[in-house]
Amino acid sequence: MSPATRFTVISCLVVSLITPSETSSWFDPFIEWARSSPNMTCVNNRTGTRSLATEGLISFNFYEASRTVRTYQVPKCIFMSSVSKTIMQGVDLFESLESYRRRYYSYIIVPVHASFQIFIHDLRTDLSSPTEELTSPVDKTLPNVTIWHTPSGYVIRLLDVVTPRFEECTLFPNHTVIFDMTVPCSQEVYLRQTGKHQFAIVLTFTPSFFVLNIQTAQHQHVTENDEDVILIFGDVRSIDVKAPYSKPVLTLRQSYRDDLLIVAKTSIVNATYPFIKTQDFLKGTLSGNYLDFNHVYTEFNRLVIHNLVEGLCDAPPDDRTVSMVFSYAVLARTLYHTSNVTARLEDVALRYVRLTLARTFLQQCFDVGPRYMRFPTIDGALSVLLKLIRNSRDVDGGLKLSLTFALIFGNNTDMTKERDLENALYEMKSIHRAGLVSPLSPRQRSLLYMMAYVTHHTTAFPDIRREMLAMQTSLCSPQELYNWAPHVSSAGLTMQEMFTPCSGSGRRDYSEARIAEIVQLNPLTTKTPADLYRILAHFDRSNLTNFPALSCISHLSGYVAVTLRDVTYVVSSNVMLKGTSYPVTNLAVDKTMIVTVSPAQHPCEKTEVAHATRSIPIVKNITIGNDCEYCKSAIMEYDEVNGLSNIVYLADTADLVLVTNLDNRILASSPRTRYIMMTANGTLMEITSVIIDIRQTSIFMIMLYCSLGVLLLYGLYRLLHMI
């Protein structure tokens, strides 16, 4: 029984002691007390001619008639604690019965206003505990955390790494329905501006439950007030409510393990959030095994797709928005609200990566990036796991990338090494080469999503990030948009599987009209150009601020940036930054295209005036030999009428052979199509053809070397037998 509950029982006993009989009639009581004393002997219903005041007791003296006083006493100490003071401050002894009744029904009473549901299902975690004996610790870098190596992988004790960083806070101060309480907590605030109105959803996590607070007031605030819609989910036994309310009448959903309480004014719910009263509210998350991380993550992604496709990220919170944030909160609570079992570190790490992916969407969907609940030990555990697998060729590159992504999201770039981004670059090159000739798979899109985040959200390792950005730009072709348009309508996709490299690239020139021109040719497309443009723009909310040579250019300027190792090319319709400008002359009269070249490490300087202008030389053909003089360069393809079409990055010789093979149809072939080579050293040239002269070892010589090797082995065999 909580302190507030115990005090309520005592208060009821006190009230029962001084309740008059039906025949009694008295005036208002006169209450007086003396200074503290160990005296605990009380009188009950004493009648006398004088009022009574006893040291250490509170005396209730009721004047019934002339010179007649009825006295009741209770110990003063029970009213002197902070809990009792708080409770007494929340009680209005002079409230009328009609006001009491109106106040009771002014809040949502679930049996009266809403649909209560109880979920009976088997709740169990999807984490499996290894059965091997833990005898081989491999790393003790983290304080109080041991990592063991077993045949099934690296193993840790769960609670050693998933405990969040909590700070003491006070919940529900001065609330009409709920008594305030001081608990360890962590808060996340999500803001959304729609027109003149600002909405906020505040998540407060505690060790036992979380609070989802939908703020309807015009000003944003961290603590809860009477105008908010409050949902409390988890173990709510420590929460106390004020009379005339009780937790059963506020319980909206229930399982054998957890309760969902709603505290909200009826008028606000009816006017703005009527979906809360329906049976389907939160059913997708709570009707299944919500301790199964994969189940909740799947439901979260289903809601994300609805919000993303239907443009709900720019609208006031509705059913799907609230349900999405609620499912995210369940994900976060599932991560840390667990028993201290052993688990594979890789499984725990992938859970954390998925939670991080969910956070990236919330960060994109709401206007202000919140301060997230931190898991300091799990960040350290991820860095240790990354250290253990960093140089292993037997570990999937996607796992290495996922760990790097999660660390950079948590501002832990110092826990990563250059080798980690080199591993990401290796994966990028593989996807880039495949993506030039075939549609990207959902897994490739998911990896590209994390690569794009890594590229844009750290300033470390600039040379590697510039090449990663160049390859994302290369993948953002009209053919990619043609393939992506029907892909976004596929069933069962996660948020990151809907990603297109166009959102993470240096191509900022695709307008809604241009997208319409491309996708209208694909009969499988079901989304409108407006829908596609909104999805594309949703993922594309960051400026290129972490690239010094591009940081001064407006996000909405309509340009293409090609970031080679030592030089930056910007293609636009007018001069945008200081550098050497190269006008493209072979265009229709109404088209203008300028290529501006600047050193990679040169700070961006915005200007609309060309400081140095040169013409682009025309080269009839270029020959590429074994030295690969044009590797780390790019080819720009443009149409004389329609302008820029494609940028193709040439990472190595294999890319050169692939791109220049006409059978692959990577570069268009038409009388109006022209090509400009953007070289790694900053030289521009218009080319008409490319000759590949990469000399390869002849088949005869290979056969000769193989024959000599066989003869040598046979000679060694005979020699050993003779000995």
Swiss-Prot record:
Superkingdom of origin organism: Viruses
Chain segments carrying region Interaction with gL: 197-263
Entry's Gene Ontology cellular component terms: host cell endosome membrane; host cell plasma membrane; membrane; viral envelope; virion membrane
One BP annotation, GO: fusion of virus membrane with host plasma membrane
PTM section of the record: N-glycosylated, O-glycosylated, and sialylated.
One of the Pfam families matching this protein, by short name: Herpes_glycoH_C
Protein's membrane topology: Single-pass type I membrane protein
Ranges of the Intravirion topological domain: 722-723
Role of this protein: The heterodimer glycoprotein H-glycoprotein L is required for the fusion of viral and plasma membranes leading to virus entry into the host cell. Following initial binding to host receptor, membrane fusion is mediated by the fusion machinery composed of gB and the heterodimer gH/gL. May also be involved in the fusion between the virion envelope and the outer nuclear membrane during virion morphogenesis.
Keywords: Fusion of virus membrane with host cell membrane, Fusion of virus membrane with host membrane, Glycoprotein, Host cell membrane, Host endosome, Host membrane, Membrane, Sialic acid, Signal, Transmembrane, Transmembrane helix, Viral envelope protein, Viral penetration into host cytoplasm, Virion, Virus entry into host cell
Transmembrane keyword on record: yes
Family, per entry: Belongs to the herpesviridae glycoprotein H family.
Protein name: Envelope glycoprotein H
Family annotation (InterPro entries): Herpes_gH (IPR003493), Herpes_glycoH_C (IPR035305), Herpes_glycoH_C_sf (IPR038172)
HAMAP family hit by this protein: HSV_GH
Signal sequence, start to end: 1-23
Ranges facing Virion surface side: 24-700
Subunit text: Interacts with glycoprotein L (gL); this interaction is necessary for the correct processing and cell surface expression of gH. The heterodimer gH/gL seems to interact with gB trimers during fusion.
Membrane-spanning ranges: 701-721
Subcellular location: Virion membrane; Host cell membrane; Host endosome membrane
